[in-house]
């Protein structure tokens, strides 16, 4: 099994190009079921993308892959979909597999999807996915670990209030509603840029969607959608991770190919800590200027601070000048990186959904183990900050969400190798 060996202590200097957003491309790939052909560009080279390709192919899709140096193009032909079951062997690898449920059900009137897998960071129940589809007229039962869904005729437009903000359920509801009969109004929706990107792709395909980027989305169902071509937006989580990498290594890095407005809340949080962050053409520049203040943080649905960056921010705060409180409001069990950071000398105490981080002068290299995707990259950041050797095990998590991570960091001076 592969591992990463990191010899830290070198400030990162240079530029990093951001890849396409994993959390946007996966639902867009699922949306291909709604039409006959979808051409997607700026697709990141990630194992989660490969898993979604395998899933779509298992349903009968034909996928042409055009490989470029930094990205894929995908041409997905779904006119011959003939299998409506998403099997456990594929779905267990990735929670995003649940997003084929809405498209299969709304276009073909039936779907059988295994309960999903992915990172072990909490329950992430599918209750809201099921509730909104039932509100559209679907008949759904959970049997033997599968969601069995069917509808008599087309799904029907509905008014539905999510009792809590759910990115995943918002996506499934939108994917189902675009081909439902009549108007669907969704309240308390997720507002994430990746949801906006999905909606923009669906509009390119001929969907009628209003309220994009707000908590109230109105969808007028169509009889069918068109072939389309769409470029996926860049990954704000990857961008934020490298912004924190620049800060924790006391470096100076230009983060390129990212719109500043979708990382603005990350930039503002870094500025609070004393890091210099300025917008540049098609990106942002992050520069350490000699201090790192302790800052409290709460994760919240967008436009709040993303839970997917909480672990990376915690790594940064382990070296701050005071005490910070980090509150995780999205997922339970998302402090699994804390024991590993403490092995490296961090002073962190977890109390429920809060972590108290007391800054230390320096971290020390150690052998550590990744528990999930975001935890793994937080340990890399910690390793980059030390003047000694860190060995990270179970790095297969990284390849689910970060393209060419070692290469991008090495190009900025990091000593990081996969063995």
UniProtKB/Swiss-Prot annotation:
What CDD domains does UniProt report for this protein, alphabetically? UdpNAET
Uppermost EC category: transferase
Q: Which ranges does the record mark as transmembrane? A: none
Residues that the record marks as modified (2-(S-cysteinyl)pyruvic acid O-phosphothioketal) are 119
InterPro entries assigned: Enolpyruvate_Tfrase_dom (IPR001986), Enolpyruvate_Tfrase_sf (IPR036968), MurA_subfamily (IPR050068), RNA3'P_cycl/enolpyr_Trfase_a/b (IPR013792), UDP_GlcNAc_COvinyl_MurA (IPR005750)
Which intervals of the chain form a coiled coil? Answer: none
Q: Which residues bind phosphoenolpyruvate?
A: 22-23
Gene Ontology process terms (BP)? cell division; cell wall organization; peptidoglycan biosynthetic process; regulation of cell shape; UDP-N-acetylgalactosamine biosynthetic process
Signal sequence: where?
none
Q: Catalyzes what?
A: phosphoenolpyruvate + UDP-N-acetyl-alpha-D-glucosamine = UDP-N-acetyl-3-O-(1-carboxyvinyl)-alpha-D-glucosamine + phosphate
What's a GO cellular component annotated to this UniProt protein? cytoplasm
The compartments listed are: Cytoplasm
Which pathway does the protein contribute to?
Cell wall biogenesis; peptidoglycan biosynthesis
Q: Write out the catalytic residues in the record.
A: 119
Which PANTHER family does the UniProt record give? UDP-N-ACETYLGLUCOSAMINE 1-CARBOXYVINYLTRANSFERASE
**Which NCBIfam families does the record associate with it?**
murA, PRK09369.1
Please describe what this protein does: Cell wall formation. Adds enolpyruvyl to UDP-N-acetylglucosamine.
Name of the protein in question:
UDP-N-acetylglucosamine 1-carboxyvinyltransferase
Q: Please report the organism this UniProt entry assigns to the protein.
A: Rickettsia africae (strain ESF-5)
> Which classification does the entry list for the species?
Bacteria, Pseudomonadati, Pseudomonadota, Alphaproteobacteria, Rickettsiales
């Amino acid at each position: 099994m592969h591992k990463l060996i990191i010899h830290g202590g070198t400030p990162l200097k240079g530029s990093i190009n951001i890849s396409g957003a994993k959390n946007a491309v996966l639902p867009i790939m699922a949306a291909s079921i709604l039409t006959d052909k979808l051409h997607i560009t700026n697709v990141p080279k990630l194992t989660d993308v490969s898993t979604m390709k395998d899933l779509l192919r298992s349903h009968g899709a034909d996928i042409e892959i055009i490989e470029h140096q930094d990205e894929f193009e995908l041409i997905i032909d779904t006119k011959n979909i003939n299998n409506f079951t998403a099997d456990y062997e594929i779905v267990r690898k990735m929670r995003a597999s649940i997003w084929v449920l809405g498209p299969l059900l709304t276009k073909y009137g039936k779907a059988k999807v295994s309960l999903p897998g992915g990172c072990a960071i909490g329950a992430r129940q599918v209750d809201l996915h099921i509730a909104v589809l039932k509100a559209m007229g679907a008949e759904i039962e959970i049997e033997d670990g599968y969601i069995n869904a069917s509808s008599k005729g087309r799904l029907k437009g509905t008014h539905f209030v999510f009792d809590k903000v759910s990115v995943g359920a918002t996506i499934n509801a939108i994917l189902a509603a675009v081909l439902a009969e009549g108007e669907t109004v969704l309240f308390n929706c997720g507002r994430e840029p990746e949801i906006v990107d999905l909606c923009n792709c669906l509009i390119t395909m001929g969907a009628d969607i209003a309220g994009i980027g707000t908590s109230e989305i109105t969808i007028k169902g169509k009889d069918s959608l068109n072939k389309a071509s769409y470029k996926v937006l860049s990954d704000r989580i990857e961008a934020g991770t490298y912004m924190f990498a620049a800060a924790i290594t006391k470096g100076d890095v230009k983060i390129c190919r990212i719109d500043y407005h979708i990382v603005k809340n990350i930039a503002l949080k870094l500025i609070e800590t004393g890091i210099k962050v300025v917008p540049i053409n098609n990106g942002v520049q992050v520069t350490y200027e000699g201090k790192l203040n302790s800052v409290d943080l709460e994760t919240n649905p967008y436009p709040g601070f993303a839970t997917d960056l909480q672990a990376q921010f915690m790594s940064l705060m382990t070296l701050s000048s005071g005490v910070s409180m980090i509150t995780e409001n999205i997922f339970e069990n998302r402090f699994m990186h804390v024991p590993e950071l403490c092995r490296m000398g961090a002073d962190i105490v977890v109390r429920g959904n809060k972590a108290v981080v007391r800054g230390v002068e320096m971290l020390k290299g150690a052998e550590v183990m990744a528990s999930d995707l975001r935890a793994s990259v937080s340990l890399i950041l910690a390793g980059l900050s030390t003047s000694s050797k860190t060995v990270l095990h179970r790095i297969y998590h990284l390849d689910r969400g970060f393209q060419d991570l070692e290469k991008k960091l090495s190009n900025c001076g990091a000593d990081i190798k996969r063995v």
